[in-house]
Swiss-Prot record:
Topology of the protein relative to the lipid bilayer: Multi-pass membrane protein
Main location: endoplasmic reticulum
Entry's localization field: Endoplasmic reticulum membrane
Similarity section: Belongs to the membrane-bound acyltransferase family. Porcupine subfamily.
Listed name of the protein: Protein-serine O-palmitoleoyltransferase porcupine
UniProt GO cellular component terms: endoplasmic reticulum; endoplasmic reticulum membrane; membrane
Organism classification: Eukaryota, Metazoa, Ecdysozoa, Arthropoda, Hexapoda
Superkingdom classification of source: Eukaryota
Recorded GO MF terms: acyltransferase activity, transferring groups other than amino-acyl groups; palmitoleoyltransferase activity; Wnt-protein binding
Organism: Drosophila melanogaster (Fruit fly)
């Protein structure tokens, strides 16, 4: 998923430039489902002998408990075991790379950085060999092509733009013409997407003032950056400068281990919810409420994303690799890739999608949105073009997936409409009900702000209820859009239902609501 890009007058007093630009949409993530046994529906059974007095809304409490217990026995244990088998080697290799770099850097004279790059490259290759097997050869071939494309930077800023177009376009055409029907490409696509983001960022960073500012990295530095063990398998994107700053570890081992444990625990919980709990609840509520079915199915997708994000955070912590941007590290978790608490209970659509993949948000804002950044006098049509262009680049980075295209365009439509409407309402009512989080009573520009009012104030409760209504609406949109991403393909299933079946059953309500927000905004503006 992506980011809400919108620029106008500041909602709050003294907002710095970073906060003004922070309305963008992330796309995406790598959605994997580990350890889910085949024939999962066979594990959820029962309830035929439930007593009638234990029935709530037509469903037995004992039936639900029985299904969850069966899921615990038949699904959770194999899921956790498979995840640990997948995670442990990656963590150990990241720790090994960190140890080797630390030992080498303690020499009296650090005459060359080449060994540090080689440590990263070697450990990254082993991780990819464990992850993708023989297909690693294809990734190395694509990396070699990428290094050749870097030579275009000698043309200056135009060379960086050509590099970006060729990098994104080549992956799109490669999948379209050759790999569309290959079952192994979807896994490689996520890895190659991160590589492409690194190439593009490196090109623009080296030609920031219109000409080549520094020497193009040598082969060792390039391979160490592209295949660093902290980011090569699951991401996220980090800039070349950030990679160089973290070549020599600085944090203590105790701090890293303290942060590593909660990331692994949350990772296990996320895969348990994704593979076992959410499918069981979706099956149980299947006959009662279509919204609940959509919500639990979408929760399975989101939890899969949380698993990947938390696993990637654990690898960053193990390698002592920091992230770009102004986002502060969490004392408990370290560098943050995703913020599930802001996704599951969002203030707005734009806030939840900004929290979906924070490094990708930073990449899109820095290299796609900022160069086309609209000014205060820019027309509304120009702003819309910039927003759609950013979403288009984000979609192309993910390769050919019609579901992602539909979700991203829908998010652009919904988030922009909500942001415009709430900004206009906040201005008319002088109330803190915009899509952005309130910065506190000292900086909020609105008189009717909950942080400035007491509990017995009417304006306090009106602002709270308005924000709560938009939160509930964002949760509905989250379920409506997320359920489309469930599954691996676009083909019609055995029961004849297409991947848009849930949208059809909901009457495309979310899209009509989005259209209504635009109409209401135009009416009151």
């Amino acid at each position: 998923m992506d980011y809400q890009y919108f620029e106008e007058e500041s909602d709050y007093i003294d907002l710095d430039e970073e906060e003004e630009d922070d309305d963008v949409v992330t796309a995406g993530s790598l959605d994997h489902r580990f350890g889910q046994p085949n024939g999962e529906e066979d594990y959820y059974f029962g309830g035929d002998d439930v007593e009638e007095e234990l029935v709530v809304d037509g469903h037995g409490v004992l039936e639900l408990a029985g299904r969850l217990l069966e899921s615990l026995q038949s699904c959770v244990q194999p899921s956790v075991l498979q995840v640990m088998q997948y995670v442990a080697p990656m963590l150990l290799l990241c720790l090994l790379c960190r140890l080797l770099c630390l030992l080498y850097s303690q020499r009296r004279r650090l005459t060359s950085l080449a060994p540090l790059h080689l440590f990263h490259f070697a450990c990254g290759l082993i991780i990819l060999q464990i992850t993708v097997g023989y297909r690693l050869l294809l990734l190395l071939l694509l990396a070699a092509v990428g290094y050749l494309l870097l030579q275009l930077l000698r043309l200056g800023r135009r060379g960086a733009q050509v590099l970006a177009v060729l990098t994104v376009g080549s992956q799109f055409l490669y999948e379209l013409l050759i790999w569309r029907r290959r079952s192994d490409w979807p896994q490689l696509r996520g890895i190659q997407m991160v590589v492409n983001m690194k190439l593009i960022s490196l090109g623009f960073d080296l030609t920031a003032s219109g000409q080549l500012q520094a020497r193009i990295p040598g082969p060792f530095a390039y391979l160490g950056y592209i295949y660093s063990p902290a980011t090569c398998a699951l991401g996220p994107w980090v800039s070349f400068g950030c990679y160089m700053d973290c070549l020599v570890p600085r944090n203590s081992w105790l701090v890293s281990l303290r942060r590593l444990l909660p990331n692994v625990v949350i990772c296990v919980l996320a895969v348990t919810v994704s593979n076992c709990v959410a499918p069981a609840l979706s099956d149980f509520f299947g006959d009662s409420s279509h919204f609940l079915v959509m919500y639990w199915d979408a929760l399975s997708v989101r939890s899969s994303h949380y698993f990947v994000g938390m696993m990637a955070q654990a690898l960053l912590v193990a390698s002592d690799q920091r992230l770009d941007g102004a986002t502060k590290e969490s004392d408990m978790l370290g560098p943050l890739i995703s913020q599930p608490w802001r996704i599951e209970w969002p203030r707005s659509i734009s806030s939840l999608v900004r929290s979906w993949n924070i490094p990708m948000h930073e990449w899109l804002k820095r290299y796609i949105y900022a160069p086309c950044k609209p000014t205060a006098s820019t027309s509304r049509g120009r702003i819309l073009v910039v927003v759609l262009s950013t979403y288009l680049v984000s979609s192309l980075l993910h390769g050919m997936d019609l579901r992602i295209y539909l979700v991203l365009i829908s998010l652009a439509f919904l988030a922009e409409g909500e942001s415009l409407l709430r900004r206009q309402l906040a201005s008319l009512l002088n109330a803190c009900i915009t899509a952005n989080l309130c910065p506190g009573k000292e900086r909020c520009r609105y008189s009717h702000c909950p942080s400035k009012r007491r509990l017995n104030s009417l304006s306090y409760w009106l602002a709270r209820l308005t924000n709560l209504a938009f939160t509930a609406l964002a949760i509905f949109h989250l379920a409506y859009l997320g359920v489309v991403l469930l599954g691996d393909d676009l083909e019609v299933g055995e029961d004849g239902d297409s991947f848009l079946w849930h949208w059809q059953q909901a009457g495309y309500l979310s899209h009509y609501i989005g259209l209504g927000t635009f109409v209401l905004y135009l009416f009151i503006s």
